[in-house]
């Protein structure tokens, strides 16, 4: 992909983000890659069939419109699934930083490489309980630990090191974070390490794979065998739970979750938001998920970003011994690329490709030129309703449980109304969702509170100052 194509793709992604909103973009478009631009066609790829089918069904016209705004001659968008590869065991040496990603093609031919581990494409008809594909690079050895992920790493390591029959400490272990912050890496590391001893059955499934497996079992009248096989697992690892759809599928997931936990089997789950924010899930499932250990992996700090960059350079050197990135370049990348770990890895891949293909050393000027589309303005902090409740409760000297209660005393009613007002103005949550998060209140109650505070801040200077102070505390 040329620099001009990279810049166009960056602008198209910006249009999509502004059109559909940050939450929708993160859920459905963040993992979409540009593969090629040919004449009147644009070739894009996503990692799963589920993402492909959902985008084609719901967002095809918007994607085409975003491209036509950039290139009016484009009349066709081809969306494919990046080929998933399965490896028998993770590579023992440092994992390769550069790996070709190609969309699925009927005419694709295998490429032999004596240094690479033997891999076989995962067949579409593979049994659901064969698990989702594992990336041999995603092990504990290649995971970079920092302040943002220390607790998540420690909890995942504790699960991986357990033995059959050991008491289960955290069940379920629920890890949530934004795109590219290491959730999938940790879950696959648990799976690799847990299966290494051969004592336990550790199964890694994406939510999409669970859904398709359950639906296929229903159609083939093998649902009972599907349930029994799942409940015979020692450690069940589920990734991208936010994509779990359908009442019957969610009900089966809830039954499986309960059966495994009640039997003392470990469940590990990852999603892009906390259980309370998974609005599409049944209340029983959210409650069960929240009953375990819920861990957030925070945004990567600069020190952690620098550690990830150094790790990726070391991995690249395993296959390209002469590859070198000066400290000044690493410092620049760590300061400038703040979005997620995938962008950091992509930056190293670009520098490696440019250095090798042009036979040039990596310099700061080259880095600034090659990664400029990855350097984004600092995004505003994402504020959560729990943060609002905590800060408001502290400001007005009440408890969070008071805000959620049915108490109608003056010292509770006003803080509750302020908190609802802030939830409406500082988050993207709907009125019904805000009401549910404030003790199961009706959306009309929330609307009344919002209008009440809106009217008061215009004429009550003291209240306006309090609200502005709360906003600053939440945004800092």
Swiss-Prot record:
Predominant localisation class: cytoplasm
Region (Domain I, interacts with DnaA modulators): 1-73
A molecular-function term among this protein's GO annotations: ATP hydrolysis activity
Positions of the UniProt region annotated as Disordered: 92-115
Membrane-crossing segments per the record: none
Subcellular location: Cytoplasm
Domain of life of the native organism: Bacteria
SMART domains found in the cross-reference section: AAA, Bac_DnaA_C
GO (cellular component) term, any one: cytoplasm
UniProt: ATP binding residues: 180, 182-184
Amino acid composition bias (Basic and acidic residues), ranges on this chain: 99-112
Stretch list, region Domain II: 73-132
HAMAP family in the cross-refs: DnaA_bact (MF_00377)
Sequence similarity: Belongs to the DnaA family.
Protein's UniProt name: Chromosomal replication initiator protein DnaA
Originating species: Bradyrhizobium sp. (strain ORS 278)
Name of the coding gene: dnaA
């Amino acid at each position: 992909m040329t620099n001009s194509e990279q810049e166009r793709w960056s602008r198209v992604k910006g249009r999509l983000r502004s059109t559909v909103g940050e939450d929708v973009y993160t859920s459905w478009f963040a993992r979409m890659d540009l593969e090629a631009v040919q004449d009147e066609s644009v070739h894009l790829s996503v990692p799963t069939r589920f993402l492909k089918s959902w985008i084609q069904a719901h967002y095809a016209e918007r994607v085409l419109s975003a491209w036509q705004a950039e290139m009016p001659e484009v009349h066709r968008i081809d969306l494919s699934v990046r080929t998933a590869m399965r490896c028998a065991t993770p590579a023992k040496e440092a994992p390769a930083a550069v790996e070709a990603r190609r969309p699925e093609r009927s005419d694709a031919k295998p490429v032999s490489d004596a240094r690479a581990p033997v891999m076989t494409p995962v067949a579409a008809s593979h049994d659901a309980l064969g698990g989702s594909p594992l990336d041999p690079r995603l092990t504990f050895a290649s995971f970079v630990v920092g302040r943002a992920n220390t607790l998540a790493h420690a909890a995942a390591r504790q699960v991986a090191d357990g033995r059959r029959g050991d008491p289960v400490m955290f069940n379920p272990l629920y890890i949530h974070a934004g795109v590219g912050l290491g959730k999938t890496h940790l879950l696959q590391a648990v799976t690799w390490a847990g299966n290494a001893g051969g004592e336990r059955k550790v199964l890694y499934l994406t939510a999409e794979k669970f859904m398709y497996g359950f639906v296929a079992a229903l159609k083939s009248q093998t649902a009972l065998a599907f349930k029994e096989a799942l409940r015979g697992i020692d450690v069940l690892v589920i990734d991208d739970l936010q994509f779990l759809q359908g009442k019957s599928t969610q009900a089966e997931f809830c039954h499986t979750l309960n059966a495994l936990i009640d039997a003392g089997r470990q469940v590990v789950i990852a999603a892009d938001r906390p259980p309370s924010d998974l609005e599409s899930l049944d209340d029983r499932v959210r409650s069960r998920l929240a009953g375990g250990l819920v861990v957030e992996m925070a945004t990567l700090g600069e020190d952690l970003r620098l550690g990830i960059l150094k790790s990726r350079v070391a991995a690249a050197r395993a296959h390209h011994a002469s590859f070198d990135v000066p400290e000044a370049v690493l410092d620049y990348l760590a300061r400038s690329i703040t979005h997620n770990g995938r962008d950091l890895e992509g930056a190293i891949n670009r520098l490696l490709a440019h250095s090798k293909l042009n036979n040039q050393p990596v310099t700061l000027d080259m880095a600034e030129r090659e990664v400029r589309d990855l350097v984004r303005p600092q995004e505003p902090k994402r504020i959560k309703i729990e943060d609002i409740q905590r800060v408001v409760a502290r400001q007005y000297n009440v408890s969070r449980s008071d805000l959620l209660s049915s108490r109608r005393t003056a010292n509770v009613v006003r803080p509750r109304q302020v908190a609802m007002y802030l939830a409406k103005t500082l988050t993207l949550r709907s009125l019904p969702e805000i009401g549910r998060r404030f003790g199961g209140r009706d959306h009309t109650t929330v609307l009344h509170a919002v209008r009440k505070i809106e009217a008061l801040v215009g004429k009550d200077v003291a209240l306006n100052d309090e609200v502005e102070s709360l906003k600053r505390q939440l945004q800092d």
